[in-house]
């Protein structure tokens, strides 16, 4: 029987929960919210698990988004996943939101995933055939004018187009808990808290032209 995974995501503008088994979605719930995840997440977990007709003893692991994204959302998701995993003695899988966008893209070439920071710069990472070819980084719009041969995807694309005129865009919906569950099926879970990917400017080198 395919292992069942409970997946949680509240790293960006939505909060979502899914129970998946391989590529199959057993139950899923999502809600748009930029705040209030701490109050909404556990009731959503209870609802989704009830509809999936699973107990924690039926799960192989818990998957959670590690960001980058909303600091509060990432922190809430990781804390919830860690608490549930400890209570049920389950391992965890952390999934980068940047990698999740690349995974979701119906695009096999060179892709630059660009996510909103709500500031003057962007979270970003470079991929080729869905595999990372750079570490995650923070960059301003001028940096992306130096990139040649890359398409762009992510929730920062619209602002990037406005700032730089970039036109090669891969249309990719922002990932949700379903995507995290599918990705986690191919990863090795561990009995430790996944590390958050906050990418604050103080922790990285700001790329400029």
Mark where each language-model region is:
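Oxyanion-binding and handling regions
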Residues: 1-25, 36-39, 93-209
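Phosphate-coordination loops involved in phosphoryl transfer and adenosine-cofactor binding
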Residues: 2, 59-62
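Short amphipathic
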Residues: 27-30
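Short, well-ordered amphipathic alpha-helical segments that serve as non-catalytic structural scaffolds
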Residues: 37-52, 98
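Phosphate/pyrophosphate-binding loops at sites that engage ATP/ADP/AMP, CoA/4′-phosphopantetheine
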Residues: 45-60, 146-150
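Phosphate-handling active-site elements
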Residues: 50-58, 86-95
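DPxDG-like acidic metal-binding loop motif
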Residues: 61-92
């Amino acid at each position: 029987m395919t292992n069942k995974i409970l997946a949680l995501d509240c790293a960006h503008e939505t909060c979502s929960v899914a129970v998946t088994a391989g590529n199959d979605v057993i139950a899923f719930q999502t809600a748009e919210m930029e705040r209030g995840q701490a109050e909404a997440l556990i009731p959503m977990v209870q609802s989704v698990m009830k509809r999936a007709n699973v107990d924690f003893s039926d799960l192989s692991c818990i998957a959670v988004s590690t960001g980058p994204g909303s600091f509060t959302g990432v922190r809430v998701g990781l804390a919830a996943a860690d608490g549930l995993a400890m209570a049920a003695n389950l391992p965890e899988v952390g999934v980068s939101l940047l990698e999740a966008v690349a995974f979701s893209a119906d695009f096999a070439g060179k892709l630059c995933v660009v996510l909103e920071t709500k500031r003057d710069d962007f979270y970003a990472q470079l991929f080729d055939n869905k595999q990372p070819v750079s570490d995650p980084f923070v960059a301003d719009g001028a940096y992306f004018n130096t990139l040649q041969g890359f398409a762009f995807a992510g929730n920062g694309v619209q602002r990037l187009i406005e700032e730089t005129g970039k036109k090669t865009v891969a249309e990719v919906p922002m990932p949700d808990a379903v995507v995290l569950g599918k990705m986690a099926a191919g990863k090795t879970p561990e009995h430790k808290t996944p590390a958050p990917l906050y990418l604050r400017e103080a922790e990285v080198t700001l790329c400029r032209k």
